[in-house]
Amino acid sequence: MLIDRIPQGHKDFVDELLKEHGVEPAGDHARARNDEAPPFWPEEAMEQLRIAFQHPIKMIINALGVPPAEMIQMGRDHGVPVAALAGAKEHALRLAAAGVDIIVAQGGEAGGHCGEVSTLVLIPEVVRALRAEGYDCPVLAAGGIMTGGQMAACMAMGAAGAWTGSVWLATLESETSQIFREKMVDARSRDTVRSKGRTGKYSRQLKSAWTDAWEGPDSPGALPMPMQSLISEPAIHRATKAAEGGNEKARELVTYFVGQGVGLVDNITSAR
């Protein structure tokens, strides 16, 4: 099992961090799901795609690399556009060469896994590079986009539209906890950080005692993906539940993926 490959030092580090914040350690650190094989094993991913295409989806999107050729072909067979995220000009060119229909150029302001190039620079760079190579696939702008004015600005730079994420995280319908939504409202744009402490790859998330600990001098260092998630997800889940129960120290650990646009969030509302 993958959990058996987690060094004891990392398990102890997480246990101590939880205890410091009044949270009972996660025990065996195992996720609720079966961890006998790496997440998103190719056969499993293809089965998920087959199920997805049985439904009336409007678009399917790939992140972290070039979509497999089978995914692109399935999109064509079902008349569903295939999009993919790019954090650099070179990424966009590889995606276009692979036959992707839509490219989401995601700047470093974005929440979750992201690169280092800002949206303001990335959009015109990607648009220019694609046109120079003869590709006419539309580009959607992503990363820090929270308002209509920002969308219009991105379209003025050549984007065909915008791809938004963080703007929805403070809504009542989102998957986030009430504790995290409240922290979003209180946060400034400088209160996010690109950290490996959650997934093992750099991902932008809200600064918290969790991210501080993994970037601190006593950190054992993040494990490679997907190992880090095996210890981070159960721990953060337990901390969130404890915070929801009134544990103020546990609240300090609560975090989630969110972009720098969080500074523009001033209330919790409905997506309707």
Indicate residue ranges for each PLM-predicted region.
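Active-site entrance/lid segments in N-terminal catalytic domains of soluble metabolic enzymes
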Residues: M1-E133
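Conserved active-site-proximal phosphate/metal-binding subdomains
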Residues: I3-K11, L18-K19, E116-P138, M146-R272
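Residue-level detector of alpha-helix initiation sites
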Residues: V66, I145-M146
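Short hydrophobic "strand-cap" motifs at the C-terminus of beta-strands
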Residues: A142
